[in-house]
Amino acid sequence: SNNIGPMMFEHITTADLVVFNRCTDELKDMLYKKNIKAMNPRAAIYLDDVNGNSEDYARNMPLPFDVDADIIDIQPEDYGLWYIDATGDPMKYDGKTVRFLAQAYVGKDVPAGSFVPGRFGMVCCADDVTFLGFLCRYPDRDQLHNRDWVKVTASITVEELPQYRGPGPVLHAITVEPAEKAKED
């Protein structure tokens, strides 16, 4: 079961629904630690126990931050969990304010007056590192350079964007401040 990522990665990343059957408590704990949701944030994932009871994986995934706080402070080591949760359930964050450390992406494919604050994340293996971030509307975007480290405080709305292929979180910058590089980037 320690090799679940490489064995199941392709199946999980392309599925709309993933069901793990006959889960013991130990298997459930292992699946939460492996963060299966990271492999496909938009998939519905259920854990069925040996008695046939079904558990919604996302609903029971513990989050290390308070989504009801006035400002949701995302610690650097928790960015990936927040990204996955916000991608899978954007309405949970609609109207909320978040603060996090990120790198700026200001490529030509980003609309004027916007940038993408994000982090590089690994879903399955080292060859699978990708930039994970949400569009952030920020009128002073021209002051940023690619890979600048910034501390972002932003309000969130849920909008339909082609990049999201459906509704997703859009950040509206309140503050964007220069920051020190994360210990683990």
Place the predicted regions along the sequence by residue.
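OB-fold and OB-like single-stranded nucleic-acid-recognition modules
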Residues: 1-8, 12-185
